Amino acid sequence: MSSDHKSKFDLELNPFERSFATKESSSVSLNELAAASNNDAISDVNSVATSGSSINNGSSSNKHNLHIPNISSVNQQQGVNGKLPGITPPLFTPGGRRLPPIGLSPGGTTSRQYSNSTNSGSLQSNTDTLGSNIWGGLPTNQTFQPQPQPQPQPQQQQQPQQQQQTQQPHNFNQFMSGMRKTGLTPNESNIRSGLTPGGLTNFGFGSNLVPGLSTPGALLNGPITPGLSSLLGITQTPSSLLVPTTSSFSQNNQSHLIQPAANTSVGPIPESTALGPHVNIPQANQLQQDQSSQALVGGLPPSQPQPQPQPVIAQQIHTIPENQSIAFDMTQPAVANAHLPESKPDLSETANLQRDLNPTADTTTNTTTATKKRKNDTAGGTNKKAKVAKGKKKEPKSKSKGKNNQEDDQNASNKPEDENVPGKENGNEENHKVEAESKEEHLQNGNETTTTKTNNTGNSSNGTTTTTTTKSKSKKNSNVSEDDKRKNFLERNRVAASKCRQRKKLLIQKMEEELEFYSNGYRELSAEVNELRGAILLLKEKHNIQDEIIDGLLSKPTTVPTNVTSIPSTIPTTLNPT
């Protein structure tokens, strides 16, 4: 590989670079391209490559071997000179036609749609040439290689479908690497600014056209990483991302796992389970066991035909070690949930009940009641065992605990006899010991076994009755307390209402007294105001009279005598004799 062998996109000139190019080199390259287009108009890609290599030996600047089909029409429009203008118009590239917008640009379309939309007028495209096959050859699975060396296609002896899947990601990966090396990807404005933002969904290389893109092999070997594929919206198959060791482990252990039998009986299934969502044990199996045991002991027919539950073998359950099961649950929770064995009740109790059957008709009723009460006791003991052994997990409480009973019965059958049990399980162990002793004595005397069972069940029934009485007393106390609370509430309301009425009466009486007081004061004040008003009017009248007198006195003229004689000052005289 030398510097001459470059990608076809490396040496292509954009309109801005074409404006600075010399007219001689551009005219020579255009003429040579026109001659090449006239000679090789209907030739294939190989003939175009050879003609391009011969042109590279000359002094032209067309080193990218791009065969442009519409060069003749451009030369005819340019005239006899064969010279390009200084700056090309925005609608035309140096080749004489607008490049199709790449699909990675926003709003871009495929080359086939663009070439179909531009095949009108003087701009005619030849689909057999290289210029259209660069953009249109990728979706149609035509060989496009940015390097002139022929790439060997792997595994041609296999099926054509597999060959197509390996060829298309190879071409697409080389195309993407070429696009990343060069910043010359044209968009709608003919500005080659590198990869513009957009998804692969707009490019036309979706999973329908290129099925190899959805496989992890093409993504890991190519320039696109799985993280980038998740960003670009390429969906991978989840089965390809699984750990091979855990999948093979699940396949090997499928033979050791027991599939659950179809549940044909109708019964309510509680929402709360003993082990969470990993083990799904239907409650109807416990109901089937109860009904079958009653039918075997008391000779009563079952309520409905029920399928025989399958016993669980202890070796099949313990095939998976603890460390492998933990790793298996960590890696594949879905597979672990699907293939965990579902525990089923044993038929040991039913077999023991068949041994304990008494042929005499007198003890059948006693045995039926004894077995019913004993099952209640064992159910209570197993519930305590589940709470002690699994104290770390907080299990939701429910009314029906059939699932817990079934799982604990199976665990008890699988455990050895010498295993240490907490203090809460002592009652359960004593019940089992008494049952074993009663079985041995039953072989000697059948009536004694029934009496021992009735004694044991009598003690348990006494415990249950005491619990029920305490519950009933608590309910009564709660009811009595609620009635007392209601009575106290009503009494408080009554006292508060009476006090409110008394305060209201006092306020009304006070308001009446104040009203009377203020009304009397108003009347007295109004009378005094009237008296003062009369006095004021009298004073006004007197004042008016005085004013009139003063005005009258002042209005009289002064008369002076004309014959005035000199009078001595010591003698008083009247000046104005009347």
From Swiss-Prot:
CDD domains: bZIP_ATF2 (cd14687). Keywords: DNA-binding, Nucleus, Phosphoprotein, Repressor, Stress response, Transcription, Transcription regulation. It comes from the Eukaryota. Residues 415-443 have a biased composition (Basic and acidic residues). Induction: Expression is induced by cell wall damage caused by caspofungin, and by osmotic stress through the HOG1 pathway. Expression is positively regulated by MNL1. Residues 508-515 are annotated as: Leucine-zipper. GO terms for cellular component: nucleus. Disulfide bonds: none annotated. Residues 485-505 are annotated as: Basic motif. This is Transcriptional regulator SKO1. It comes from Candida albicans (strain SC5314 / ATCC MYA-2876) (Yeast).
